[in-house]
Regions:
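Class I S-adenosyl-L-methionine-dependent methyltransferase catalytic core
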Residues: 1-77, 83-161
Length: 161
C-alpha cells in the first residue's frame, strides 16, 4: 500500500466517532421533537442517534447521499454527528439554509456562539467527563466535544413542567 493511501485511510478512521446511546439520551430527551420531520444526514440506521429517535417514535430518516446533496426542505430539523473534519462547512451550510439543528462538534468551545446563530447544547464534555465514542476498530475513546444547536432553549421550559 502506498504511503498516500495509508495516510488517507488513517484520516478517514480518525474522523469516525460513533456516539454512545446514553450520551444521545442525555442530550436529546430535553428537546421537544414531537411532530418534527428529522433528518440524520451523517448517520445510518445503526447509529445511536437514529436508534434513539426511532425508539421514541419520531419521524426520522437517514440518507445515504453526501450531506451536501440532500433536499433539506423536506425536514424540520437536522440531528447528527457529522465528520469532525467537515463540521465548520456543515454548520455554515445549515445556517445558510435556515434549518434547525442539533449536532455534536469536537472542541465545542472553539465554535462558541457565533453571531447569535448557535447555542451550546445541554452537554459540554471535557476532562474526565469527556464524551465517549466508539471507533470503527471497536475501541472506545474520549473526545472533548459537545452539542450545539440553533434551537431556542425550550428544554428549560420543559424541565419546569
Amino acid at each position: 500500500m502506498t504511503q498516500q493511501i495509508k495516510t488517507c485511510k488513517r484520516k478517514v478512521m480518525d474522523d469516525e466517532f460513533y456516539t454512545m446511546y446514553k450520551d444521545v439520551v442525555r442530550e436529546l430527551h430535553k428537546y421537544d421533537l414531537r411532530n418534527k420531520r428529522i433528518i440524520c444526514p451523517c448517520d445510518n440506521k445503526n447509529s445511536n442517534i437514529y436508534k434513539y429517535l426511532k425508539d421514541c417514535y419520531y419521524d426520522v430518516k437517514c440518507d445515504d447521499r453526501e450531506w451536501k446533496n440532500i433536499d433539506y426542505s423536506k425536514y424540520d430539523i437536522v440531528i447528527t454527528n457529522p465528520p469532525f473534519s467537515q463540521v465548520r462547512e456543515f454548520i455554515r451550510y445549515l445556517i445558510s439554509i435556515k434549518i434547525d439543528f442539533i449536532i455534536i462538534v469536537s472542541d465545542v468551545l472553539r465554535y462558541g456562539i457565533k453571531n447569535n446563530k448557535t447555542n451550546f447544547g445541554i452537554g459540554i464534555y471535557k476532562g474526565k467527563d469527556a464524551q465517549k465514542f466508539y471507533r470503527p476498530d471497536g475501541t472506545i475513546t474520549a473526545v472533548h466535544c459537545g452539542w450545539i444547536s440553533n434551537i431556542k432553549d425550550d428544554w428549560e421550559e420543559n424541565e419546569k413542567l
